[in-house]
């Protein structure tokens, strides 16, 4: 048992770590672009310009709503079609998503430019900051199509397993944005419009790299107008809406906070808040990406009704909070002056105002990570209404109420204190809800799953093994046959399941394993008349084209066990996501 636990930890840790890294890389472009703008603006254009930068920050949340709906919807819908081997429908959703992305993003950019004056006022710009906020927004609005389409194309590149292209696009974003900002400040002696324009240019540079990935011959995705099926639009948008709820809250929350800060503390306080906004993009990154990992991994395990793996995934995310997020918290609290100086240069008054803001903000990071993980978890277990309601409470109601109440009582320090207070209150809310659900105080992770007692698979109906070698593949195949026989599965079906496991295992070991810690996981569940086989390995990713060609090979002896089992299957799914190959066969 100890050996199997060790094997289990290897693949779970490998999947979790690889997925987390992929999420962080994918989010880095926007984070770094905003961070570079904030740092250079504060140091070289002054405190007022930095305040304008902070006021305009909801712009990223607004564009994020559109990006979230399209990218999340495309991921949900197309992943099933890729897994089922339906490349034509996958290309249809790709073409539809790209078409909608271009039309909606260009429309949004045009409306933003036409109505830029009221848009600037809605964001909270007063008379002193109106001109600079307006100029910055104008530069950013020109880049909306590139921002939206970059997010959309990134999703499809991840589905194809081309993470190197995503990394290259992030690198291009950093280089072009930094170079453009420096050119604007030191050569053109420009203003906030130039800063926004440089950011837009960096997104277009990244978009060009992403587009090139789809032009190459090895790409499965091709945009064709004839592939667009407008009837899929409703499904695409509805599947993407849950993720958009948090983005919507991110738009309206800063408006209330900005108004409160300016009213209580003026431009100096707003520049302090802008430093917090700019640094938060980096400091919150680990926590928010942990939440994204939980959405994916717990969503898979929820579909399998695998209570134990759900608990293990949550436990692993909490360990990252203890060692990762707590380290970030210590850095932000102890390095508050360094962070403020990084953004504000030698502006002593602004630096002193920013230090307490950063320190109190740092205290919220562990609670924020915990809360974000549970927001993602509620989405993963399919409780959409609960996820929406809790997101509104967390992202809007608690923090805005805390800012207004504590700010009116304690002044600007009360506003800064509202950030950790609101997160602590929401953490307490989750614990109370867990206690009500379990009818006792939560004492272990299984008390925090918010799942009915009947959820899960009887251990007697589940077969679970690991494969490291060809010998393991053969022995696992025999054990799988015995398991199926015990469950009174007909002989032919039991033989094909065993043969399929042996062929998948030997293929993974022979062609996919090149490192010490690579391993394959096999699970079979047998309930009533349903039989499900899941094969997962963390070896070299399958080539999707070869996967689809497997169904049409002229060599009838090639992969005979796999092909014959596929002929009996009710549903076949394959995905090379989260740095693993996943084959799911339902009989």
Q: What kind of feature is each model-predicted range?
A:
Residues 18-37, 139, 150, 173, ...:
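Transmembrane helical elements of multi-pass membrane transporters/channels
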Residues 447-465, 566-587:
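Flexible, glycine-/charge-rich segments associated with ATP-binding catalytic modules
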Residues 478-502:
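Conserved short strand/loop->alpha-helix "switch" segment adjacent to the catalytic nucleotide/phosphoryl-transfer site
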Residues 50-110, 150-166, 272-330, 370-390:
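Small-residue-rich hydrophobic transmembrane alpha-helices
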Residues 71, 140-159, 166-177, 195-210, ...:
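Short runs within selected transmembrane alpha-helices of multi-pass transporters and secretion channels
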Residues 1-23, 78-143, 187-241, 298-364, ...:
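Short alpha-helical transmembrane segments in multi-pass integral membrane proteins
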């Amino acid at each position: 048992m100890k050996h199997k636990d060790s094997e289990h930890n290897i693949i779970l840790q490998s999947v979790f770590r690889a997925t987390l890294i992929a999420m962080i890389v994918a989010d880095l472009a926007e984070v770094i672009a905003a961070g570079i703008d904030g740092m250079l603006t504060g140091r070289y254009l002054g405190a007022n310009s930095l305040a304008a930068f902070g006021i305009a920050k909801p712009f990223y949340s607004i564009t994020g709503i559109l990006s979230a709906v399209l990218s999340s919807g495309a991921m949900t819908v197309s992943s099933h079609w890729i897994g089922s081997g339906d490349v034509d429908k996958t290309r249809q959703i790709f073409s539809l998503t790209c078409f909608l992305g271009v039309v909606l993003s260009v429309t949004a950019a045009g409306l933003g430019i036409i109505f830029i004056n009221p848009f600037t006022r809605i964001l909270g710009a007063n008379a002193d900051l109106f001109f600079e906020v307006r100029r910055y927004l104008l530069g950013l609005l020109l880049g909306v199509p590139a921002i939206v389409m970059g997010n959309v194309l990134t999703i499809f590149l991840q589905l194809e397993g081309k993470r190197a292209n995503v990394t290259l696009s992030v690198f291009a974003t950093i280089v072009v944005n930094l170079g453009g900002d420096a050119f604007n400040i030191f050569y053109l002696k420009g203003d906030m419009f130039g800063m926004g324009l440089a950011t837009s240019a960096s997104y277009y540079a990244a978009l060009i790299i992403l587009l090139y990935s789809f032009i190459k011959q090895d790409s499965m995705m091709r945009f064709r107008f004839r592939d667009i099926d407008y009837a899929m639009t409703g499904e695409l948008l509805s599947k993407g809406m849950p993720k958009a709820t948090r983005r919507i809250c991110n738009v309206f929350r800063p408006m209330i906070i900005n108004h409160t800060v300016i009213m209580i503390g003026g431009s100096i306080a707003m520049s302090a808040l802008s430093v917090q906004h700019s640094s938060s993009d980096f400091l919150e990154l680990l926590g928010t990406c942990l939440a994204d990992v939980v959405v994916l991994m717990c969503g898979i395990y929820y579909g399998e009704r695998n209570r134990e793996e759900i608990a293990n995934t949550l436990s692993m995310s909490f360990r990252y909070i203890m060692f990762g997020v707590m380290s970030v918290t210590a850095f932000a609290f102890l390095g508050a002056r360094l962070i403020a100086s990084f953004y504000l240069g030698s502006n002593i008054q602004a630096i002193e105002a920013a230090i307490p803001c950063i320190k109190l903000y740092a205290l919220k990071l562990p609670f924020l990570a915990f809360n974000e993980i549970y927001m993602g978890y509620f989405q993963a277990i399919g409780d959409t209404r609960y996820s929406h309601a809790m997101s509104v409470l967390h992202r809007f109601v608690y923090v805005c109420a805390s800012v207004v109440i504590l700010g009116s009582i304690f002044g600007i320090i009360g506003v800064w204190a509202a950030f950790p207070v609101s997160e602590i209150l929401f953490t307490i809310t989750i614990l109370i809800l867990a206690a009500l659900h379990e009818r006792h105080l939560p004492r272990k992770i299984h008390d925090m799953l918010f799942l009915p007692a009947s959820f899960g698979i009887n251990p007697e109906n589940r077969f679970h093994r690991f494969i490291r070698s060809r010998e393991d593949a053969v022995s696992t195949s025999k054990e799988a046959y015995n398991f199926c026989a015990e469950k009174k599965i007909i002989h032919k079906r039991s033989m094909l399941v065993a043969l399929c496991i042996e062929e998948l295992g030997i293929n993974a070991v022979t062609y996919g394993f090149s490192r010490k810690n690579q391993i394959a996981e096999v699970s079979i569940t047998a309930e009533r008349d349903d039989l499900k086989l899941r094969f997962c390995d963390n070896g070299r990713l399958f080539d999707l084209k070869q996967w689809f060609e497997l169904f049409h090979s002229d060599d009838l002896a090639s992969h005979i066990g796999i092909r014959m089992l596929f002929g009996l299957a009710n549903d076949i799914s394959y995905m090379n996501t989260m740095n693993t190959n996943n084959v799911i066969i339902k009989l």
